[in-house]
Amino acid sequence: MTTPDEKTFATLTKLFEEEFGPIGDRQVLYVHAPGRSEISGNHTDHEGGHVIAGSLDVAVDGIAVATDSNKIRVADEGYPTFEITLDTLDIQESEKGTSASLVRGMAHEIAALGVEPHGFDFAFTCSVPSGGGLSSSAAVEAAYGRAMETLWGAPAIEPVTLAQMSQRTENNYYGKPCGLMDQAAVCLGGLAYMDFEDQAQPKTQKLELNFEDHGYALVLVKVGADHVAATDDYAAVPREMQDVAAEFGKTRLCEVNVADFDAKLPELRAKLGDRACLRAVHYWYENGLVDKRWAALNAGDIDQFLVLTRESGASSAMYLQNVVAKLGSQQPSMYALALAEHVLDGRGAVRIHGGGFGGTIQAFVPLDLVDTFITKMNGWLGEGSARHYAISDKGAYAAWL
């Protein structure tokens, strides 16, 4: 479907006209960008590793109308309307960490293709939970990018190229470090395997697969702690992995030979500490698990996929250590994982999801247990904490209505 359903369009039109006035007979552009779930490859993307991700049935949906001004005005349902001027597309230090920085960053990227930026009004809703590890920011970036691409008459942008633009925007304009997986999953759509060793041209493959057809539901559970608050903890993961790589004169772990790492471990431990070494161990182990899980999914072997997913979850907890930020009495992610394991009772699989340190956990739940699982997790963690998601086949796009 390349047009919004009737209810979504009515909501968007109401929001737009409340903020910007009647649309009248002006041409309307519809924009859609899904959220994503990391299916496998926990913190491997920023080291040039492998990932499997899927776009989800939650999304940024918006409508845009061109104007004669040099301003982009944005109405985001539930948040104050804001605007930026197009006088300069340079990084604004005062905007870092704000929604305006994403607009300016994507405008800079699209304008760099050789097109003239023009003003427009954009109203959108977002059903992607914020701070829950489903990449709401990547969906917003992709939505802005597709809107600008179409409104400004830019050449067609390939999904991975748009993802790279979005990543640069988040890194440089918003000021948050991130790999390419979030943006690539949002832009590609469906279930996708990604190899990030070649940063300029990542390799991607896609697979049509519905977990429900294999007897399992993809359930994400909000743990009750927003991972946005753990930016420093998140940033320490790639920093420590890359500290290890730097000891070999490299920038990412994908460039380091594992045998060389093994030979130098005592020296690395003495200089960088245990955690950096453990995180490097996780990278290579998890990277191998990604490839094995992709092979299992392609073979339709869901049981093997689940065995490997449980191994991945253990590696994240023990070696990557992105479940608990600081040991203490409050450990919401570990608490949620324990409760999920308790309900699953050896069936399915559960793991930390995405960046970690809060946000969400991911569970593959047998279909006959889904209602019980969601009811119990909601009872323990709060109504609406657990939700059953489906893989969506559409990546970010824009279409004239």
Predicted regions and their residues:
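C-terminal nucleotide
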Residues: 1-36, 61, 65-96, 193-351, ...
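Gly/Ser-rich oxyanion-binding loop with an adjacent helix/lid
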Residues: 1-51, 84-89, 95-213, 370-373, ...
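Structural signature of FAD isoalloxazine-binding scaffolds in flavoprotein oxidoreductases
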Residues: 50-69, 188
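Short, conserved glycine- and acidic-residue-centered signature motifs
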Residues: 55, 99, 329
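Short, flexible active-site loop motifs that bind/organize anionic cofactors or intermediates
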Residues: 131, 295, 360
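FabD-like malonyl-/acyl-CoA
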Residues: 138-139, 360-365
